[in-house]
From Swiss-Prot:
Its main location: nucleus. This is NGFI-A-binding protein homolog. Belongs to the NAB family. Residues 111-189 are annotated as: NCD1. Expressed exclusively in a subset of neuroblasts in the embryonic and larval central nervous system (CNS), as well as in several larval imaginal disk tissues. Co-expressed with sqz in a subset of neurons in the embryonic ventral nerve cord and with rn in a circular domain of the distal-most area of the wing disk. One of its GO terms (biological process) is negative regulation of DNA-templated transcription. The keyword Ribonucleoprotein does not apply. The gene is nab. InterPro entries: NAB_co-repressor_dom (IPR006989), NAB_fam (IPR039040), Nab_N (IPR006988), NCD2_sf (IPR038398). The lineage of its organism: Eukaryota, Metazoa, Ecdysozoa, Arthropoda, Hexapoda.
Amino acid sequence: MEASSNPTTPTTAVATTTSTSSPSPAASTSSKGHSQSATASASASATQSQLLTTSLEMPKTEDLYNLSVASGLSEGQRSLSGAPSASSSPIMSPQGKIFGRNANGTMITTSRPGNEAEVQLYRVLQRASLLAYYDTLLEMGGDDVQQLYDAGEEEFLEIMALVGMASKPLHVRRLQKALHEWANNPGLFQGPMMPHLGLCETPPKPALIFNPDTTPALPRQKFPSFNPSGSSFMPSPVPPAPLPASASVPAPTVPLATQISCPSAPSVPLPLVLPPNPLTSSPHPSANSNLPANTAHQVSSSSPQLTPVLTEAQIQRITMCADKIGRQLPQREPRAQTTRKRTTRELEQVIAMGEQDPRRMDEIRKYSAIYGRFDCKRRPEKPLTLHEVCVNEAAAQLCRNPQTIWLLTRRDELFPLARQIVKDAGFGHSASIARYGGLLTQLPSQGAGLGGGRAPGDTDCESSDAAVPSKRQRLSSTEAAQLPLDLNREAVEDSRYNLFAMYQKFAKPPFDLSEIAKFSVSKAADYEDNDSRFSFSNSSSPTMPTPCNGMEGERSPVSRQMETSSPPRESVDLSGTSSGAALSGVQVISAAGDNIIAVANPALALSPALNEVLALKRSAASPET
């Protein structure tokens, strides 16, 4: 009795909890024959031995009973993190578990931090959305964040391999970014654990089953599209129940224990899903009707990372082009794998997954990645470019179709198809991706769009032809308020574009010289002599392939002037004929029959020297009267 009333005993509260199961007679007998100080020390040592014996001899049924809350969490959430389960740790005490919320909104059950170093590690992993690795790092003594930050490249990769993060380069990159933030501003990762961090300690006997159907959505401002009751995190395809109307906007101070439904009688501790409570559910299912179907993808893409993230419009564009190419591919069997690796078995499991499996798209993205795959030798700190992200997304969308999922085993055929999809979608390089990303947002506001009278969703995938009018409009949309130098440069760009298009059309015989009138220079006149000094005669024109009819390639302006000054042999000045009015901008210097030998560069039309030479040639070619 004296030992129980002694205030100096450090573990009095714990001793009262365990004394009911295995009381210690040694502590009571020793307290009667010794002094007050000896009684306190003896009772403390006896209590510690009781705790050690109880923790080592705990039956398996009690372990399963206490871990029911951790097993009741959705397996879809743990599969998204890709980390080992936190409830499988052998050193974790069921009484010290808490629910932690990652930065991307996922709930993870971890052990409660006990000191300042563990709090810093917890906050760093929470900032990187990697709380699933918290208990694994504690098992290996990784509670020193400074040691992780100061580790060299080989040592850091070895630690990542021991933790199980080496095969997930995106997780490694997020951890490195969080460590750099911790080094730059350590004040954000210090301080006691506050309730606003989304933590809730588990009861000593957590005979509760987490019910995602009756759990209202927590108030979140940074990620409004995330909802823990969505069907993307369900372990089985169970239709989601409507959210209660009274609990749609709960108070921030409501503990998590009120959001976990408790059964009325003791049941088997399995991760069962209870039916929704008819007393609290509302017959209006409008609170959950506007959730997107790809909630898991939005959660993963909102995590802090250095790799660019595609917008929904860009993903929709790539998906449309992938479906178009996928319909043209034959249905084949997956290639037989000869190696007995673990990835081979996992790949077969991914191919056998059903279309309703919430993990299917994430696993397809994992194994269909062309750049930065989990088993590649790419450096983790080297982020992917926007083009590489597009190629990876195109490969994933192409393998999403059950008819073309066999491409997961034929990466040599998947790579060129993915690049073709990106090219058809108009995402050939980063500049076109950024430009087309802004163009897609303007499509609903335009009446006709790129496809004339078609809807924006029916735009043809061959966007190279559709982007030509916008490019030409961008080149020729000069306002009168611009400077004369800008006007001159814009005119030269238009002239070169028209000349290049003309050569493309008339590179192969037979010709129709009457169609040359379609290519006219719009800004080839009304310029002063001062502006004509900005001539681009030294710049190279577009190189054209030499046709089979022996047409000469591009020649310098000096050679053209030498030819025009020589006596015309079989030259025909088409500008002096009756169709000269139609041929307003293009001047044919020399031609033999229907074959054009030399055409004046429209960019040099501003030069007075060339105009004088052409005037002399025109007067020499005209019949004498």
